[in-house]
Structures are given as structure tokens and as C-alpha cells.
């Protein structure tokens, strides 16, 4: 069976659809006439992580050799001797370092492609890889047989988790799992030394956004510790304000283009928060718990050791993604590991989000993306139970409701099966499917506070 799509991204008019399957990015282009999709490009992350480990081992070997040499003393005859108590075992110079190999029972290592982001002019695509903790940059050149041209690969000290481009696309802002944010040039050669962070949190960063207020730019960052921080940019050492109100982790931030002074945020709490980030005010919160509760399963239960054992049902819901359209006052909210998507409408009069529609899907939703030009919502599904079909569902706003474009959905399914059914690198079994749901793992429990 073909592996489910882990991540989707589309350009503003929906003519390009990027799909991540295992460790490969596929770019599909529609001909614009009958909705037929053609494979326009692809890129596979074949980086050998063992080489990265070997390089780190070699670096450590050289450090220990230098440290050992510095600890040597000399006798009266000028001969070097080891200082007592420093007889550490160090590798001999010139000897190949021994690269550690996972032993029996070690968890599998996945070559994740963790996120995708288009530049504002849609001429560049950036992806984050787990294999070497890098951001990889592509030029989108549709006149070529393969439209994805890799031109830069920038490694980072820790795994990237979220990215966004500066307004002029000259810089990429990247948030990592260590709590640091980096700003690197989008063009030019990769920095040979580890880049220096421009700001940081004391917890894993989960999302990042760049906003503008009266010609001043700010970077908004969210973390696993329910914090949302607003910092000046590029003077990011200056903190403008904090937004307090969440009790659990924040997994997704969304600044709507139709009201750039607002910010939506959600994660492990039972609500979606609406902020006036410029004033630092919590405008309202939308409680989605009663809507999502009927769609939760035993997969949403906490680990057995954290159950109350009192017969209570403690299924925990999380929002994995928030999205908005360019000129439509709707918010798309994706509850993780469920078969529904919430469509919320912003009521400017009451200053609140109102449930407009609940989309019911045949399978769990994995990822979501929207087009800004024609109000399309594209969802990828966990189709392990229905291999070969239901890779995506495409919805369009018609008469105030989002309706499925069945022909468009089928066109994507047909293109994937046509191009990938004979490709062994994207084949899998049910037991070997990459983990598709990551957000709920951000929830902190007793073991994280000890």
C-alpha cells in the first residue's frame, strides 16, 4: 500500500499541491482545464544520518585528543608524561571513530520531513528534515522536468519544528525543539558554523509567526509550556509582551490576513483563543470540547499510569492546526486524530468565533491546507484502512457552506495511484506507517515536572 500523506501544502490558487509521503516531497500541478493533475517534481531526503553521527563522533575524538594533550606534563628530561588521575581512554590519532549502532529493541528511526513553507512570492519552498536537522531550500521552476531544484541545505544544532519567511523572503525564521529561534539567509551558501539564535524560550517551540504593526515587525512564538511571546524583529532581544491565558501547550498560531491585529491560538486546552496581539488582550475563547467529545476514541486516553482509575473517561482532545483564508472571516481548526474539522466564523459584532460547520470525514484527518484565491480546503487523511483511495478530500465554499469537490478529490487520488503505485520507496505496511499524530505528545504530565 502507498503510505498516507503526512503533510500537504498548496499555493495561493491551488494549481500546485505539495505532498510529503515518508521521506519524499511530491509536487503536483493541475492543468487548469479538467482538474487533471500531473507530477511536476519530487525530492527524496536520502541523507544518511549515520554520516552526521560519524562527524559528531570525529569532532568529539579530536576534542578529547586535544584535551589529553593539554593535560600532559614534562619530566626533568623534557619527556611528556600523563598527569596522574587523567588516564582517560581516548582514541588513537588517525583511527576511525566507532559509530554507535542502535541495538535490539531500539525504537525505529524515521526520516521525517517535518514541515513545508512557501515564500511569499511562491518561488521558493522550504522543508525541515530530521535526518540532519536541516532546513532545505528549493527553487520552484515549473519549466523544468523536476520543478524542485535544491539550492541550499542549512543544518541546525537541534531539530527544526516550525518556519516562516520574513516579509521580503530574504530571511527564514526557524523555531527548534530546544526553544531557540534562528534567522538565516534564504539565499547564499549555508553557514558552516552553527547559526546563533536570535531569541529563545525555556521550552520546546511549537509554532512561529511574523507580524507587522505600524511598520514595526514582531515575531510571535509559542511553546510547550503554554507561553506565547511577542518579540521585536529584528531586535528580537527586546520582548514586547506575553500573552497569558493558556493552561496547556500551544501547538498552532494563526494571524488572519483579513484582520492582522488578531491572533488565534490553540493546542492542548479545550478552547481556541482569540487575541488582539497589538494590545495584548484576550478577546474571547471558543470552547470546542462538547463538539469534539463524541468523536474521541480510546486513542485519546492518556497513558494508563495517568488514568484516575475511578471509572471516569478522560479522553483528551488537542488542536493540531489552525488556518484562515485570505479574505474570508473563517477559521479552520483540526482536532488531532479525529474524523472532523471545525469551521468557525468570526463575528465582528460580538467579537467571538461562532461554529459555522463541522465537516465529517470518512477517516482521521492528518493535515490541512487552504488556497487563498478560491477558498478551497484540502485535507489529507489517514487512509491505512482504505489503501489506494481517500488520500485527500477537497472542499469549496458554496452558498455559505463548504461542500466536497468529489471530482477534485478523485483527481488527486488517481494521480497518486497512477504515479506512485509502482514506487517501492513510498510503499509500506500498516505496521510500518510513520507516526502521523505528534501534537498530543506535547501534553505535560507528572513525569515532566519531577
Curated annotation (Swiss-Prot):
Main location: nucleus
Keyword list, A-Z: Nucleus, Repeat, tRNA processing, WD repeat
Residue ranges of the region described as Disordered: 69-103
Keyword Nucleus: yes
Swiss-Prot/TrEMBL GO biological process terms: tRNA (guanine-N7)-methylation; tRNA modification
Database matches in SUPFAM superfamilies: WD40 repeat-like
Sample GO molecular function, one term: enzyme activator activity
InterPro entries reported for this sequence: Trm82, WD40/YVTN_repeat-like_dom_sf, WD40_repeat_dom_sf
Localization terms from the record: Nucleus
Pathway(s): tRNA modification; N(7)-methylguanine-tRNA biosynthesis
UniProt GO cellular component terms: cytosol; nucleus; tRNA (m7G46) methyltransferase complex; tRNA methyltransferase complex
Ranges of compositional bias, category Basic and acidic residues: 69-82
WD repeats: 108-147, 200-241, 245-285
Family in the record: Belongs to the WD repeat TRM82 family.
PANTHER family cross-referenced by the UniProt entry: TRNA (GUANINE-N(7)-)-METHYLTRANSFERASE NON-CATALYTIC SUBUNIT WDR4 (PTHR16288:SF0), WD40 REPEAT PROTEIN 4 (PTHR16288)
Primary role: Required for the formation of N(7)-methylguanine at position 46 (m7G46) in tRNA. In the complex, it is required to stabilize and induce conformational changes of the catalytic subunit.
Subunit structure: Forms a heterodimer with the catalytic subunit TRM8.
Protein name: tRNA (guanine-N(7)-)-methyltransferase non-catalytic subunit TRM82
Name of the gene: TRM82
